[in-house]
Amino acid sequence: MGPLATRGFTLVEILVVLVILAIAGGLAVAVLDRDERGMAAREAKRFAGALEYAAARAQSRNETLGVTADRAIRFWRREPNGDRWLPLDDDDTLAAHPLPEPFSAAPFTYAGQRIAGNAIVPLRASGRNEPFAFALVSPAWRVMLAADPLNRVTIAGPVAIAP
């Protein structure tokens, strides 16, 4: 080495290290995103917010809305002149939301009684809704979402499901 030689890293070496760090960071995010318990909590919060928003919208627009859940959360609007339910497609917040694998959801109770899994739970324009509950489940976790007559949604869980 001569007197003008300097020690350091070349641009290529620095770029290789940055690529390795980016790949490791991407893998870490992918692993963390697969945390079922965390996903259950996030999906429950999203669903609870959508339920409260839908109840407020039903009151403010004087319309009856409904909600169903299975592999996706769907909101419906009841025709004013009939008994038909139409998919609600004019609101991004209430657009159909597919649940990530392996989650599913179902109505659990309505007005204190068990309810069929394919039932539409109504959200009345008057704001006087019966209490209802939905279950959000995966093979390992269960979250219960319960709405009271004042349209406040509480979240219980995630709770581990015994094998």
Residue ranges and their predicted role:
Residues M1-P3, V12, V16, I23, ...:
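N-terminal helix-rich module
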